Amino acid sequence: MPIEINKVYCCDSKIGMQELINQGIKVDLIITDPPYDMPCMKPGGKSRIADRLRKEMNELEEAKLHLGISNDYLELMVKLQDKINIYIFCNGKQIEQYLDFFVKKHKCKYDILIWNKTNAMPCYSNKYLTDKEYVLYFRKGGLCNPRCYEDAKTVYQSSLNAIDKKRYGHPTIKPLPFIIKMVKNSSMEGDLILDPFAGSGTTLVASKRLDRNFIGFEIEQKYVDICNQRLQEKEGLLEISN
């Protein structure tokens, strides 16, 4: 499967990344939102909140976005870069895994960015609100060059992405302005950016908007179609590659 830039491929990211390695293709930046490691706990009851939680958990299960990823995927990400330069979304349970791999094993520097959700679901029975998601930024020779104070902030505040989630049909869509900041801070025009878990294509749209090249891998065909729909809206036609 020869891989070309500025295309989205419907395949398992492990297969896609190995093919990039086989072809000798290196990437300058990886921004990705892999599956979170989370238990399949569904609330009982008949309240609107319970119904909404069950619906969201069902969506995550259907898309297999609750199983986490193994270090095999992380090893491939490292092999694809001359300098480690990776943003990876995660939940609190995964932080230890990623720090062990990137910091202990590969001696990376790291920063923790936070997406603070201003309208998180009001569920706090025997727990704190689930009102944030983490982005771990690992680098070893990678570029971190915020242009201004605002770009250097580590906390991004916004509401849940309800409009885009409904429009594009992906359960874990991320805010485009947040991704744009990462692309601006850690790459240059013409660089090649990879998202091995492309989802609805937010990283790819941000890359194209900022004159970066991109490659995306996504295992679900329906989300590959959404990626291409979004890219067509912004930048013209792109083909789907299987």
Report residues per predicted region:
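Core catalytic lobe of class I
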Residues: 1-225
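Short, conserved SAM-binding/catalytic segment
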Residues: 1-4, 228-242
